[in-house]
Amino acid sequence: MEVQVAPLRSWEDFFPGSDRFGRPDFKDISKWNNRVVNNLLYYQTNYLMVAAAVVAIVGFLSPLNMLIGGTVVILVFLGFVWVSHNKDILRRMKKQYPTTFVIVIMLSSYFLISYLGDVMVFMFGITLPLLLMFIHASLRLRNIKNKLENKKEEIGLKKTPMGIILDALEQQEDNINKLASYIPKVKE
């Protein structure tokens, strides 16, 4: 299936008034995780633009350190994904505790970058965009259009870059399994 880039959402949709933002339910982690995953899928191009702006600013101020930092994070991420696919215990951990898995990747990257050089580049150039994405995805309430687009991604009608990343983190399999078990019930 061909990878499609999600459209850039309008500013009014991406950052509307305060009525479209809400505090996540910290007691229901699966619901919060679902909101984050769905917002990451729906607003992925907007998040990419925000991250690109932050990376460009930090990269302009310190290009070599930004290149080293980005390379380290990508290599650590790919290494952890590869190991988790080959080691069953890590695969289960990644599936049960996705936030912990991402934190381990970020901490490993942090220590490698601190060993290699400039930690501030890591903090502002790599961690800040991820933090901004997570905060927005956690607080932004979903709308009907968001839900419809996410269903296309879940059932495989559409494949996007964020969908590929979330698949690598095994965050979409549960949704597909739920949908697959729901379809026969609807037919009855």
Swiss-Prot record:
Q: Which GO terms describe its cellular component?
A: cytoskeleton; endoplasmic reticulum membrane; membrane; plasma membrane; presynaptic cytosol
Q: Where in the cell is it found?
A: Endoplasmic reticulum membrane; Cell membrane; Cytoplasm; Cytoplasm, Cytoskeleton
Which UniProt keyword terms apply here?
A: Acetylation, Cell membrane, Cytoplasm, Cytoskeleton, Endoplasmic reticulum, Membrane, Transmembrane, Transmembrane helix
Q: Which domain of life is it from?
A: Eukaryota
What positions are modified (N-acetylmethionine)? M1
Q: Supply the InterPro entries for this chain.
A: Prenylated_rab_accept_PRA1
Asked whether the UniProt record includes Transmembrane helix among its keywords, one would answer yes
| Cytoplasmic-side positions | 1-35, 78-93, 136-188
Q: Look up and give the membrane topology term.
A: Multi-pass membrane protein
What are the transmembrane regions?
36-56, 57-77, 94-114, 115-135
Biological process (GO), any one: positive regulation of stress-activated MAPK cascade
According to the record, the residues making up region (Targeting to endoplasmic reticulum membrane) are 136-188
Its main localization is endoplasmic reticulum
Question: Which PANTHER family would you find in this protein's record?
Answer: PRA1 FAMILY PROTEIN 3, PRA1 PROTEIN
Q: Which family is this protein grouped under?
A: Belongs to the PRA1 family.
Functionally, this protein is described as follows: Regulates intracellular concentrations of taurine and glutamate. Negatively modulates SLC1A1/EAAC1 glutamate transport activity by decreasing its affinity for glutamate in a PKC activity-dependent manner. May be involved in membrane traffic.
How this chain assembles, per its entry, is:
Binds to prenylated RAB and Ras superfamily members.
Protein name per UniProt: PRA1 family protein 3
Q: Which organism is it from?
A: Gallus gallus (Chicken)
Gene symbol of the encoding locus: ARL6IP5
